[in-house]
């Protein structure tokens, strides 16, 4: 089995610093496991590692997708698995780093082999959701796939749309696909959670927003708008991106933009903490305790050389 180290946790907790340290100690290669950091036009707003940080060791799957391209767990697996295999073959320790828990779960536990959904079908359901609202589509899903509807919040528009598009495109409910057996994982994983409390994170997140603005986040958003001026494009859905879009369009003041940005980031961190607290065999460690992280990685992954 291929040893991998997964470094997860809420946004702003210090995952990047931990990954760079472990990569230096264990001759590691960093692989992005964050659905927002794939977008090439938002390196500052999505807090991607700097070019200097990326030059310190191999980095993969950062800043390569266009604003109108859609990332998913399936796309992530198709890209990440060959990279993990190649880096392991070169004697480097793969480090999966990010806050998208679904991608980590797909990698370690497998994912349903759902066929690609035609863009026309996806767009149709997105437009219906925008026109009718998520609760109305949730009621429709209750009739078509009650098992999936039961576990989704009526306002969870993204997952409701996903379930309906799968139902239409494949003729089978999403719950059927999720019930199908998946092959065993080829990875031996150690999972590190960079610990943080929501109250402890909040001032750090507020400071990070100010640092992003000072680093050119507003110009970054303006440039991105010149590339794609469609707020429903996948790249614009990220926190920070959507709020800056509203500010540039004159819908909110800069102060309100920053308030919404912080509020939405905090809510996202809360959801991440809830998700990762349910993750089995996850070792929560202080982000500054690099020695403890080293011991944990040594005990499970050992040396790749």
UniProtKB/Swiss-Prot annotation:
<keyword id="KW-0067">ATP-binding</keyword>
<comment type="similarity">
    <text>Belongs to the IPP transferase family.</text>
</comment>
<dbReference type="InterPro" id="IPR039657">
    <property type="entry name" value="Dimethylallyltransferase"/>
</dbReference>
<dbReference type="InterPro" id="IPR027417">
    <property type="entry name" value="P-loop_NTPase"/>
</dbReference>
<feature type="region of interest" description="Interaction with substrate tRNA">
    <location>
        <begin position="34"/>
        <end position="37"/>
    </location>
</feature>
<dbReference type="GO" id="GO:0006400">
    <property type="term" value="P:tRNA modification"/>
</dbReference>
<keyword id="KW-0808">Transferase</keyword>
<dbReference type="GO" id="GO:0005524">
    <property type="term" value="F:ATP binding"/>
</dbReference>
<comment type="function">
    <text>Catalyzes the transfer of a dimethylallyl group onto the adenine at position 37 in tRNAs that read codons beginning with uridine, leading to the formation of N6-(dimethylallyl)adenosine (i(6)A).</text>
</comment>
<keyword id="KW-0547">Nucleotide-binding</keyword>
<dbReference type="Pfam" id="PF01715">
    <property type="entry name" value="IPPT"/>
</dbReference>
<keyword id="KW-0460">Magnesium</keyword>
<protein>
    <recommendedName>
        <fullName>tRNA dimethylallyltransferase</fullName>
        <ecNumber>2.5.1.75</ecNumber>
    </recommendedName>
</protein>
<feature type="binding site">
    <location>
        <begin position="11"/>
        <end position="16"/>
    </location>
    <ligand>
        <name>substrate</name>
    </ligand>
</feature>
<feature type="binding site">
    <location>
        <begin position="9"/>
        <end position="16"/>
    </location>
    <ligand>
        <name>ATP</name>
    </ligand>
</feature>
<comment type="subunit">
    <text>Monomer.</text>
</comment>
<keyword id="KW-0819">tRNA processing</keyword>
<dbReference type="GO" id="GO:0052381">
    <property type="term" value="F:tRNA dimethylallyltransferase activity"/>
</dbReference>
<feature type="region of interest" description="Interaction with substrate tRNA">
    <location>
        <begin position="158"/>
        <end position="162"/>
    </location>
</feature>
<dbReference type="InterPro" id="IPR018022">
    <property type="entry name" value="IPT"/>
</dbReference>
<feature type="site" description="Interaction with substrate tRNA">
    <location>
        <position position="100"/>
    </location>
</feature>
């Amino acid at each position: 089995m291929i040893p991998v180290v997964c470094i997860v946790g809420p946004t702003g907790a210090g995952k990047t610093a931990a990954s760079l340290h472990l990569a230096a100690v264990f001759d590691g290669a960093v692989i992005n496991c964050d659905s927002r950091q794939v977008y090439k036009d938002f390196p500052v707003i999505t807090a991607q590692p700097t070019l200097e940080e990326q030059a310190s060791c191999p980095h993969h799957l950062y800043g390569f997708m266009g604003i109108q391209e859609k990332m998913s767990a399936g796309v992530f697996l198709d890209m990440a698995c060959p990279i993990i295999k190649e880096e392991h073959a070169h004697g480097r320790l793969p480090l999966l780093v990010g806050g998208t828990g679904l991608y980590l779960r797909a990698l370690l536990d497998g994912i349903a082999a759902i066929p690609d959904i035609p863009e026309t079908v996806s767009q149709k359901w997105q437009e219906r959701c925008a026109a009718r609202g998520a609760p109305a589509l949730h009621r429709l899903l209750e009739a078509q796939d009650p098992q999936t509807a039961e576990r989704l919040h009526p306002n969870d528009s993204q997952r409701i749309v996903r379930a309906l598009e799968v139902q239409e495109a494949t003729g089978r409910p999403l719950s059927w696909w999720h019930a199908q057996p998946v092959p065993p994982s080829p990875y031996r994983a150690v999972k590190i959670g960079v610990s943080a409390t929501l109250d402890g994170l909040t001032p750090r997140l507020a400071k990070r927003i100010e640092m992003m603005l000072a680093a050119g986040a507003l110009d970054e958003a303006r440039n991105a708008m010149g590339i794609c001026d469609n707020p429903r494009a996948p790249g614009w859905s990220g926190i920070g991106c959507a709020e800056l879009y509203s500010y540039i369009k004159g819908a909110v003041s800069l102060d309100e933009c920053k308030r919404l940005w912080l509020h939405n980031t905090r809510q996202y961190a809360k959801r991440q903490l809830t998700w990762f607290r349910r993750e089995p065999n996850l070792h929560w460690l202080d982000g500054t305790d690099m020695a403890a992280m080293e011991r944990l990685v040594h005990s499970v992954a050992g040396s790749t050389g």
